[in-house]
Amino acid sequence: KAKQAQSRLKALSKLKTISLPKERALKEIRFPDPEELASPLVAIEDGSTGYNKKAVLTKLNLRIDFSDKIALLGKNGEGKSTLSKLLADRISLLNGSLTKSSKLRIGYFSQHQTDELRKNETPFEHLSRARPNKSVSERKKILGGFGIGSDQSELKVSAISGGQKARLLLLLATLDNPHLLILDEPTNHLDIESREALIEALTKFSGAVVLVSHDFHLLSLVSDKLWLVKNGSVRPYEEDLESYRADILVKKP
């Protein structure tokens, strides 16, 4: 077993199940489990990607299998978000090949997507547009599954907290029961309870996950594979997160 997979199991074994008071029950987050697909879900061979025909990442040879939980490591500006966008179909390859399972559904979350929400609409209206055939009670139940209660669901997006916006984006990203979840800094606006709820939801999720985050607690409990994005390339990082963190500290001036 890879070192990070072993480290993750140890970290999970240390977690104690905490029973939350009823008033906090809405903090729970539930991701729907997709049907299993044959691996690989995604395969990239000799790929390069970037912006305006200028490559940011080159010589990409990557594979994502069903149930993989992958953390992208690397300094800011190395291309972690670029790789996330490529996997999420937000940008394309400049060279090489990218093949995906024909039935693959992808959910993508980025902290910058808050700009894509309609500020004068409520969370309920956002969901109603995405799921017009669902009954009012079904829509309320879906919102409740992401900790957005009846009162908050009727507030305009401009009036809800950053954490509630993040929950709404997570909900919209997972409506289609994605096989692959790509999450770029998902905990930035979440409070501690919501962060723990997200971790629990991701550890229970049966599909594949690709994570970009500075939250080492999240990464240590969710990821069992590490990819290092550095100097325009992406390669497996064979050590565990603790080794990576120690490596960063040693190299800091």
Residue ranges: model-predicted function:
Residues 1-14, 66, 235:
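A conserved P-loop NTPase coupling/switch region
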Residues 4, 18-20, 52:
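An intracellular "coupling" helix at the cytosolic face of ABC transporter transmembrane type-1 domains
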Residues 12-20, 246-253:
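C-terminal boundary and immediately downstream tail of ABC-type ATPase nucleotide-binding domains
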Residues 25, 31-253:
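ABC ATP-binding cassette signature C-motif
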